């Protein structure tokens, strides 16, 4: 008798689900890592600053939508935002970029489209939720918040200067940065896939049914889960789609919108660079908007 034959059927089922999710997600994580590495090497805050509109509202919308052209995983987005702020990119441009770049970039949008059975519904609603949060945060920072959002005694950011490298050296650096990011994201992906497979196999259906019967509770539960799992945005859609039958559309939408904006690893990085008062207000605004938005989507659908 082989080892696999001696295992309970539930373990084999959970293992099969785990592998199916991770195999689907890995190509997107790999592509996202390479693109993120290219941005690290070739795109500088100075280049971004030259394209900023003159008026404040224009800069808010610029920050909200520029993530489509410059995709960045949330795993390393906070140091990038700090770098933007150091180069005098306004907070009402940098923070909207923080919340939308990991969601509205083409890799994540296509991953979401693929994970949800080639359907545009989740793709559009996820992107709309991110843009809504970014716009409100931008307006808050541009017209309500006074002063800087950075800490005075913030962690010094070590800036890599790739400008002096040759073309071949830059390409090599792209892959070095990509490998670092791939393995950094991979560990969170493994835990997320493991959790999703365990939920589907071992959590009794009656418990999941009772939770999904109370939409607000299900939304809050998956928002907390997304915060704790700290998944990368290139892979979270595959975890979310596996939870769809257990929790419903609106809770999974909240899981996908809030995760790239607010999770454990991002919060820890924010504490190194940003004021505590701003972090609390950021958390409050993001949580309330995602909660209300997801609930209203659930009511209307």
Task: Place the predicted regions along the sequence by residue.
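Structural signal for the C-terminal ends of transmembrane alpha-helices
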Residues: 38-43, 202, 264-265
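Selected transmembrane alpha-helices and immediately adjacent juxtamembrane segments
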Residues: 1-34, 46, 50, 124-223, ...
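Interfacial helix-start motif at the membrane-water boundary
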Residues: 24-25, 63-68, 228
């Amino acid at each position: 008798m082989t080892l696999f034959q001696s295992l309970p059927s539930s373990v084999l089922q959970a293992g099969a689900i785990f592998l199916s999710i991770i195999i689907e997600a890995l190509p997107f994580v790999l592509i996202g890592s390479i693109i993120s590495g290219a941005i690290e090497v070739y795109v500088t805050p100075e280049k971004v600053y030259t394209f900023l509109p003159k008026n404040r509202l224009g800069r808010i919308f610029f920050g909200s939508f520029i993530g489509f052209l410059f995709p960045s995983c949330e795993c390393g987005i906070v140091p990038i935002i700090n770098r933007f702020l150091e180069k005098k990119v306004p907070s009402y441009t940098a923070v909207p970029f923080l919340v939308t770049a990991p969601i509205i970039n083409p890799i994540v949008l296509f991953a979401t489209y693929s994970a949800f059975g080639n359907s545009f519904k989740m793709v559009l609603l996820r992107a709309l939720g991110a843009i809504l949060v970014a716009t409100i945060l931008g307006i808050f920072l541009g017209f309500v918040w006074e002063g800087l959002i950075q800490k005075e005694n913030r962690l010094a950011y070590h800036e890599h200067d790739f400008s002096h490298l040759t073309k071949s050296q830059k390409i090599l650096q792209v892959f070095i940065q990509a490998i670092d990011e791939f393995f950094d994201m991979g560990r969170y992906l493994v835990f997320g896939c493991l959790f999703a497979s365990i939920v589907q196999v071992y959590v009794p259906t009656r418990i999941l049914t009772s939770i999904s019967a109370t939409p607000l509770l299900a939304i809050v539960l998956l928002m907390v889960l997304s915060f704790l799992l700290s998944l990368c945005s290139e892979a979270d859609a595959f975890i979310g789609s596996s939870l769809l039958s257990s929790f419903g559309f609106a809770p999974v939408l909240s899981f996908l919108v809030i995760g790239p904006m607010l999770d454990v690893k991002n919060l820890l990085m924010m504490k190194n660079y940003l004021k505590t008062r701003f972090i609390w207000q950021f958390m409050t605004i993001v949580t309330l908007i995602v909660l209300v938005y997801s609930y209203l989507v659930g009511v209307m659908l």
